[in-house]
From Swiss-Prot:
It is an enzyme of class 2 (transferase). It catalyses: cytidine(1962) in 23S rRNA + S-adenosyl-L-methionine = 5-methylcytidine(1962) in 23S rRNA + S-adenosyl-L-homocysteine + H(+). It comes from Salmonella gallinarum (strain 287/91 / NCTC 13346). This is Ribosomal RNA large subunit methyltransferase I. GO terms for cellular component: cytoplasm. Residues 9-86 form the PUA domain. The gene is rlmI.
Length: 403
């Protein structure tokens, strides 16, 4: 396409001196950087982003109601945002996942990790021959038809299921959507394979897209710590860590979650892998309350896995989240036998690794115990982090030895 025949997009003009992040190829433009919009753009529509002198910087999606006013699709002026664009992005992403799936023997993985795969606001997880789609931003929703068409071109044998039923869409005035897009309806529970485990995934009703693929490598790493140990698995969801602990030879694993449905699937996962169900206990309870009750009754564990949901959605909640992480990790440290292992995680993007490490150190001081950091975790390799978007590193964790 020549420049003379190129679509004419509305122009988002930045204030003087506010182009630096785009020159470093960061994919967001915040409201404070915007001078004006030239032309009319509907919610999610494609716009050109220029500096205060009109110099072209990037092409992105317009989000007038969001603090992130524009999310960048491309830094290449020659790229039009159309089906061919999405097809190219999908094929780029698929190359890495194909290699990874072959090396690690995976049938399920994250195909698109938003900004880090050049598709801001788009999450796509593959479970067997099902593609589960989440559109989290106005731009992603605006391009829904083009994206689905590109998916059908790249993966014609896959069924597509929409799980855009996430509250963040409401912030931009978008309805929550869920249901089949193309192909067959996923079964109530779909079996997948991960590092020798068989696991049941609830695509239609489970958390997020149905399963936390980002913790795959951490679940495998758990096995080295658990042989002949008593394990407490907090916020267990459907028991991925529990199954891995049993495969690692633990003496007992106690899984705690507030959802009975999740615990029922966890039990089925233990049975599916033909593991000793007598070594697995499933407790429906609030983790904070249960840890305090365990402390009062003198319960002790050798390994504790702490994988809570996101405690912080925005900067105003960060201090409260820090207190929550500190409290729950202090309780865990107090419940560990000397020499015990704490595997603790945060999936809050605003929580940096350095801050999380400091919180664990403060929790250890409050618990009156010494703690050694012995291993560090992050999201699995199918959840890449592009160098210019450090916010993409949202999952962090530590293995700690408690003295």
């Amino acid at each position: 396409m020549t420049e003379s025949t190129f679509p004419q997009y509305p122009r988002l003009v930045l204030s003087k001196g506010r182009e630096k992040s785009l020159l470093r190829r960061h994919p967001w433009v915040f409201s404070g950087a915007v001078s004006r919009l030239e032309g009319k753009a509907n919610l999610g529509e494609t716009i050109d982003i220029v500096d205060h002198q009109g110099k072209w910087l990037a092409r992105g999606a317009w989000s007038p109601a969001s603090q992130i006013r524009a999310r960048v699709w491309t830094f290449d002026k020659a790229e039009s945002i159309d089906i061919a664009f999405f097809t190219h992005r999908l094929r780029q992403a698929q190359q890495w996942r194909d290699w990874l799936a072959k090396k690690d023997g995976l049938d399920s993985y994250r195909l698109i990790a938003g900004e880090s795969d050049g598709l801001p606001g788009v999450t796509i997880d593959r479970f067997g021959h099902f593609l589960v789609l989440q559109l989290l931003s106005a731009g992603a929703e605006y391009q829904r038809a083009a994206l689905i068409s590109a998916l059908q071109t790249c993966d014609p044998d896959c069924a597509i299921y929409d799980r855009s039923d996430v509250a963040v869409r409401k912030k931009e005035g978008m309805a929550l959507t869920q249901g089949p897009v193309t192909g067959e309806l996923p079964p109530a529970l779909l079996p997948i394979e991960e590092h020798g485990m068989k696991l049941l995934v609830d695509i239609q009703g489970g958390h997020k897209t149905g399963y936390y693929l980002d913790q795959r490598d951490s679940r495998l790493a758990t096995r080295r710590y658990v042989e002949n140990q008593r394990v407490l698995n907090c916020f267990s969801y459907t028991g991925g860590f529990a199954v891995s602990a049993l495969m690692g030879g633990c003496r007992q694993v106690v899984s705690v979650d507030t959802s009975q449905d999740a615990l029922d699937i966890a039990r089925q996962n233990v049975e599916l892998n033909q593991l000793d169900l007598s070594k697995a206990e499933f407790v429906r309870d609030d983790v904070f309350k249960l840890l305090r009750a365990y402390r009062e009754h003198g319960e002790k564990f050798d390994v504790i896995i702490m994988d809570p949901p996101k405690f912080v959605e925005n900067k105003s909640q960060l201090m409260g989240a820090c207190r929550g992480y500190k409290d729950i990790n202090m309780l865990a440290i107090q419940l560990l036998n000397p020499g015990g292992i704490l595997l603790t995680f945060s999936c809050s993007g605003l929580m940096t690794s350095d801050l999380f490490q400091k919180i664990i150190a403060d929790a250890a001081i409050d618990a009156g115990r010494d703690v050694q950091f012995i291993e560090q975790f992050r999201q699995a390799a199918d959840h890449p982090v592009i160098a210019t978007y450090p916010e993409g590193l949202y999952l962090k964790g530590f293995a700690c030895r408690v003295m």
